[in-house]
Swiss-Prot record:
Residues annotated as domain Tyr recombinase: 107-293
Species this chain originates from: Natranaerobius thermophilus (strain ATCC BAA-1301 / DSM 18059 / JW/NM-WN-LF)
Keywords: Cell cycle, Cell division, Chromosome partition, Cytoplasm, DNA integration, DNA recombination, DNA-binding
Segments crossing the lipid bilayer: none
Function: Site-specific tyrosine recombinase, which acts by catalyzing the cutting and rejoining of the recombining DNA molecules. The XerC-XerD complex is essential to convert dimers of the bacterial chromosome into monomers to permit their segregation at cell division. It also contributes to the segregational stability of plasmids.
Protein name: Tyrosine recombinase XerC
GO biological process, alphabetically ordered: cell division; chromosome segregation; DNA transposition
Complex formation: Forms a cyclic heterotetrameric complex composed of two molecules of XerC and two molecules of XerD.
Domain Core-binding (CB), residue spans: 1-86
Classification via Pfam families: Phage_int_SAM_1, Phage_integrase
Entry-linked InterPro entries: CB, DNA_brk_join_enz, Integrase-like_cat_sf, Integrase_catalytic, Integrase_recombinase_N, Integrase_SAM-like_N, Recomb_XerC, Tyrosine_recombinase_XerC/XerD
């Protein structure tokens, strides 16, 4: 099982050109499934796994209170693996094709008000870490890029003259993301007054090209970024469950509330399908309903 799984991951990296972050998610999901089949059924070959075994795995996930979207993602990973193994003639048939995908719950994205965003962005201090964190928060909100996209930014991806970032999104698709004046000012402050101090901590002979650095002068991790965002959320006493992705949701929602065209927002977010962007129109409708019910005398 392990060798076939590793071959599949190499296929995703080499042939599909998927990002390290996406391949890592495939690895985690499929390793969990592999361990389940080993421990529960003593199955050690993918060719031995039937659709009934996969159903048991899905039932296990449901018992563990995994969200439907997470379960659907794990099943999708299994299907992709089985499709690959069938094509490579490592298994006789693709039994995963017999399973229906769990219906995803259509959750409205969590987003902040403009006032809450301002409080969050102004929470970091004036030390090197605070200047870095403020720049990170500004970039999230002003550009709407994903966590993985921000994490992967190098100095050469930033053009201060034009005010654009070159980001690599899902499927290794590159796009330009505009930065507003506030984000540019925060980045310049970080570049001139904080990044050089952090870079001094780097013991490596080679310079680090990463835009955002940690206390060791190397690229900050995605986990650390999440942790820093959570810290400032707690400081501002926000009632929302805020993550870096919440700032992306806020970016899209505030653009639409300001009258932006849905197609333009799709381009800015890097969505392949406009149906993914349309969920933000539901957010606006929910907001309008709330305002109407609260303030209209005939509601």
């Amino acid at each position: 099982m392990r060798n076939e799984l590793l071959d599949f991951l190499e296929f995703l990296k080499g042939e599909k050109n998927l990002s390290h972050y996406t391949v890592d998610n495939y690895y985690k999901d499929l390793t969990q499934a592999e361990n389940f089949f080993n421990e529960q059924f003593e199955l050690y070959q993918w060719d031995e796994v039937t659709h009934k075994h996969i159903r048991h795995f899905l039932a296990y996930l449901k018992d563990k209170n995994y969200e439907k979207s997470t379960t659907a993602r794990k099943l999708s990973a299994i299907r992709s693996l089985f499709k690959f193994l069938t094509r490579e003639e490592k298994i006789r048939s693709n039994t995963s094709a017999l399973l229906a995908t769990p219906k995803k719950e259509r959750k409205l994205p969590e987003f902040l008000s403009i006032e809450e965003v301002e409080m969050l962005i102004n929470a970091p201090g004036d030390d090197p870490f605070g200047l870095r964190d403020k720049a990170i928060l500004e970039v999230f909100y002003c550009s709407g890029i994903r966590l993985g996209e921000l994490w992967g930014l190098d100095l050469q991806n930033l053009d201060l003259q034009t005010g654009y970032l070159k980001v690599t999104g899902k499927g290794n698709i590159e796009r330009l993301a505009p930065l507003g004046s506030f984000a540019l000012a925060a980045i310049e402050d970080y570049l001139y007054n904080a990044r050089p101090e952090l870079l001094k901590k780097n013991k490596s002979v080679e310079n680090c090209d990463a835009l955002f650095l940690n206390k060791f002068g190397t690229r900050i991790s995605q986990r650390s970024i999440r942790r820093r965002v959570k810290k400032y959320v707690q400081q501002t006493a926000s009632e929302h469950r805020v993550s870096p992705h919440s700032l992306r949701h806020s970016f899209a929602t505030h653009l639409l509330e300001g009258g932006a065209d849905l197609r333009a927002v799709q381009e800015l977010l890097g969505h392949v399908n406009i149906s993914t962007t349309q969920i933000y129109t539901h957010v606006n409708q929910a907001r309008m309903t709330e305002v109407y019910n609260k303030y209209h005398p005939r509601a």
